[in-house]
Regions:
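PLP-dependent amino-acid enzyme catalytic core
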Residues: 1-369
């Protein structure tokens, strides 16, 4: 199976799976697939991300690092709405999809160099990367914002990772994590193309669980863009391979405070807040490094963007809990956006919809009552 890791700006090919940016121009790298998805190649006795291992050709089968992630339930909420319970992944969020693929692809390379990994995260990705690193026998150093959520901090710490708290913006955290040190390999989930590529397994699952009938719309929360880019890649791969007839409309959902993508696709100016205080504390990327790539991909699939208010997020959080789904407020942003569009008659309540619930409520200190 052919694939290429290419620069999203100048098009130069990278041949080193450890690289996260172009060696020529410094811009982000992107995974390009040059093979079809074939349903006959699904490993049907495997109910994890690695059910689709034949579509991740850069990972050696005997080097896979897994905690049983993926194949999460797709639960019917109403006649036309399903929710995808990514909160039931091993570390409690969708980030495990990216971590299993990235760590599986590179852990032996890092071990041969006697190195360790570094990552920057507001919580979920740090916890996920720490878990898969320890599973692989790698040391991990996780850089987190000074105001990181208590439960997420505890989770990262429990996996044995070294934690470095960084004052200042989310960008400052990434800057520290990227800083070169002996034997340190930066595997930041935002910039590393293999992490984003691992997320496309989510699209394969949704399609297979719906018997390859694509929903009209997918609602998902957006911060740095790894989820939306991975989901778009997966659905495009299925459509390009003629497994599905089309791609769904991807609806990206953001908070008013953190809405750079919403403003970009609406051609509006965006002024980020001095401090992010939203209850959706996993959505913090006010200046995402992949913003241009996000906007380009969203336009290509004729996607949409919705911005929600704090009170709408809180109401959605409470409503989901009363339906039996205890998710973190950042997940509730997607449900809030869906209900807002139905109320405003921007979508039909009869449209077939999948809402991705990205993380567990066990990681939040917010209460539904």
């Amino acid at each position: 199976m052919k694939y290429e890791v290419r620069c999203s700006a100048c098009g130069q090919t990278s041949h080193n799976l450890l690289y996260f940016q172009c060696s020529s121009c410094g811009k982000p790298l992107d995974m390009q697939l040059h093979f079809d998805f074939e349903t006959r190649k699904i490993c049907r006795n495997d109910f994890s991300v690695w059910r689709y291992r034949r579509f991740f050709p850069y990972v050696n089968r005997d080097e896979i690092i897994t905690l049983g992630e993926g194949w999460t339930p797709l639960v019917r909420l109403s006649d036309s709405v399903h929710v995808k319970l990514e909160s039931l992944n091993p570390t409690g969020s969708f980030k495990d999809r990216g971590s299993t693929v990235l760590i599986s692809a590179i852990h032996e390379l890092i071990k041969r160099k006697r190195g360790y990994i570094s990552e920057d995260s507001s919580g979920n990705a740090g916890a996920s990367m720490a878990a898969y690193a320890t599973r692989a026998g790698l040391k991990a150093k996780i850089y987190v914002p000074e105001n990181v959520s208590g439960p997420k901090y505890t989770q990262i710490q429990s996996y044995g990772a070294e934690i470095v708290k960084v004052a200042g913006s989310r960008g400052k955290v990434a800057e520290k994590a990227c800083k070169q040190e002996p034997r340190k390999f930066y595997v930041g989930h935002i910039l590393h193309p293999l992490f984003r590529d691992g997320i496309r397994s989510l699209s394969y699952e949704i399609a297979e669980q719906l018997d390859w009938e694509i929903p009209d719309r997918i609602y998902l929360p957006v911060s740095a863009g790894t989820l939306m880019l991975g989901v778009i890649s997966g659905f495009k791969h299925l459509a390009d391979s003629n497994v599905t007839k089309s791609t769904p409309k991807i609806v990206t959902c953001q908070t008013r405070q953190v809405s750079p993508l919403y403003h970009r696709v609406k051609n509006l100016s965006y002024t980020p807040p001095d401090e992010v205080t939203s209850i959706a504390d996993a959505l913090v990327s006010v200046n995402p490094p992949l913003l241009e790539l996000m906007a380009k991909n969203l336009r290509e699939v004729k996607g949409g963007a919705v911005m929600v208010e704090e009170e709408e997020i809180l109401e959605a959080f409470k409503e989901l809990a009363m339906k039996g789904f205890f998710v973190e407020p950042s997940s509730a942003v997607a449900y809030a956006a869906y209900t807002k569009q139905v109320m405003n008659k921007e979508t039909s309540s009869d449209s077939n919809v999948v809402i991705i619930l990205t993380g567990t409520g066990l990681k939040t200190t917010l209460r539904s009552k």
